[in-house]
UniProtKB/Swiss-Prot annotation:
One of its GO terms (molecular function) is N6-(1,2-dicarboxyethyl)AMP AMP-lyase (fumarate-forming) activity. The active site is at H180 (proton donor/acceptor), S307 (proton donor/acceptor). Its EC number is 4.3.2.2. It comes from Dictyostelium discoideum (Social amoeba). Transmembrane segments: none annotated. Pathway: Purine metabolism; AMP biosynthesis via de novo pathway; AMP from IMP: step 2/2; Purine metabolism; IMP biosynthesis via de novo pathway; 5-amino-1-(5-phospho-D-ribosyl)imidazole-4-carboxamide from 5-amino-1-(5-phospho-D-ribosyl)imidazole-4-carboxylate: step 2/2. The keyword Plastid does not apply. This is Adenylosuccinate lyase. Keywords: Lyase, Purine biosynthesis. Gene3D superfamilies: Fumarase/aspartase (C-terminal domain) (1.10.40.30), Fumarase/aspartase (Central domain) (1.20.200.10), Fumarase/aspartase (N-terminal domain) (1.10.275.10).
Length: 466
């Protein structure tokens, strides 16, 4: 078997479709979840920690660098962080065989060469910390920023906004409902879309208001031992809790940890995105079914091909693509949320391994959001077919009739309607059948008139305002 060694990484050679075929649609997330992004976030945490240390009067060697100008120059190390800087850190790592130590050495070198800081000063980089103080702060920071800046805005823009527009546009259009795949009490097109809107909004509210973004910042085994022994007069717990808020107001430091964050809240966040995807899979399957029933038509896109052999095909590929990608995302969300909270004793390395894949399910989710958006943009409501289906299913008003008859004290109304409407084969209950049945009832004429006003088109119940 031949071995190819000269293949360069690009969109065609990438093993993952996220970095290959779909790169153009998901590259925005590389700012948060790529190797470059992780390194940059680590540098940011180290720098901001050093700046906060410099504000402590007890740390005499740092008093001289506690100036705004110094802080600006220090922040420029990560604010102006380039790919070449990340490459330099990776080069250092080849010697250290330790990614966080490589970040530490990179920053120290920058301080020496560009800021002319003494070695006494630079030794306060990574002071009292373990690697997981950096990772378990940098990664939650990348997650919260990606959720706030990309994932939730994309979900709202791609799906909630067009769904809400359609719901408003079609709020009064009656539609035959189907339970167990069979005709059921009518509803409206707009209300059925609002079901998904409400479900999604509930999950977004849960993400924004109820899922905390927690981090770990407490030294080798979570007790701030090195901090306490070196500067016992400082309240390091208060310092650490304030520090993580400097990075992002939503970050919250866990007080009781091992060497690593317990990830319970990361798991909660991943589970929330899994639920969002599950709701969207439900949406995709429903719209797919409505398209197959010709309740929706799809706008033709010039140049597109639906089948390599059947020229007539116009397939609901956007919803199918989204469903498939959300399945991949959910499998990864499930593994991450189940695995991350488990670590042997005070720490094993398994969390580090799987955390490197945390951007992958988010990428598949973003890809799905955009795919659904494309699919929604092609939808055209087929009102004629929807009306035709309603008119062919007059049996659905039997619920209304038997309920009014119950109100009037009519004997065995359910059984009477069941006898009329529960038919088999190709026989359909028509408007005429319903009218004839009503006329045969021994009830007052005004009740007969009330019953005759009920049709599959107006028997839609109470639709809340939206």
């Amino acid at each position: 078997m031949s071995t190819t060694t000269n293949i360069q990484l690009n969109n065609l050679t990438a093993i993952s479709p996220i970095d290959g075929r779909y790169w153009g649609q998901v590259q925005v997330l590389s700012e948060y979840f790529s190797e470059y992004a992780l390194i940059k976030y680590r540098v940011q945490v180290e720098i901001e920690y050093f700046i906060e240390l410099s504000k402590l009067s007890e740390l005499k060697p740092l008093n001289a660098v506690n100036k705004e100008d110094d802080h600006k120059k220090l922040r420029d190390i990560y604010l102006q962080f380039k790919e070449s800087d990340a490459q330099k850190i990776k080069q250092i790592e080849k010697t250290t065989n330790h990614d966080i130590k490589a970040v530490e050495y990179f920053i120290k070198e920058k301080m020496h060469t560009e800021l002319q800081y003494s070695e006494v000063v630079t030794e306060f980089i990574h002071f009292g910390l373990t690697s997981q103080d950096i990772n378990n702060t940098a990664i939650p920071l990348s997650i919260v920023e990606s959720v706030e800046k990309v994932l939730i805005p994309q979900l709202k823009q791609s799906i909630l906004e067009p769904l809400r527009q359609f719901a408003q546009q079609w709020k009064s259009i009656p539609m035959l409902a189907r339970t167990h795949g069979q005709p059921a009490t009518p509803t409206t097109v707009g209300k059925e879309l609002m079901v998904f809107i409400e479900r999604l909004e509930n999950q977004i509210n849960h993400l924004e208001q109820s899922v905390p973004h927690t981090c770990k910042f407490g030294g080798a085994t979570g007790n701030l031992n090195a901090h306490k022994v070196s500067y016992p007069a400082i309240d390091w717990v208060v310092f650490s809790e304030k520090f993580v808020k400097v990075l992002h107001p939503s970050l919250k430091r866990m007080r009781f940890t091992t060497q690593i964050e317990h990830y319970d809240n990361v798991a909660s966040l991943l589970d929330a995105f899994k639920r969002i995807n599950t709701i969207l899979i439900d949406l995709c399957r429903d719209i797919w079914t409505y398209i197959s029933m010709e309740y929706f038509n799809q706008k033709l896109v010039k140049g597109e091909v639906g089948s390599s052999t059947m020229p007539h095909k116009v397939n609901p590929i956007d919803f199918e693509n989204a469903e498939g990608n959300m399945g991949v995302a959910n499998a990864l969300y499930e593994h991450l949320s189940a695995k991350l909270p488990i670590s042997r004793l005070q720490r094993d390395l398994t969390d580090s391994t799987v955390l490197r894949s945390i951007g992958v399910p988010f990428s598949h989710s973003i890809l799905s959001f955009k795919s659904i958006q494309r699919g929604l943009s092609k939808l055209v409501l087929n009102e004629a077919n929807i009306a035709k289906d309603l008119d062919a299913n007059w049996a659905v008003v039997s619920e209304a009739i038997q309920t009014i008859l119950r109100r009037e004290g009519f004997p065995k109304p359910y059984e009477a309607l069941k006898e009329l409407t529960r038919v088999s084969g190709s026989k359909k209950i028509t408007e005429s059948d319903i009218q004839t049945f009503i006329d045969s009832l021994s009830i007052p004429d005004d009740i007969k008139s009330e019953l005759k006003l009920i049709t599959p088109f107006n028997y839609i119940g109470i639709i809340p305002d939206f």
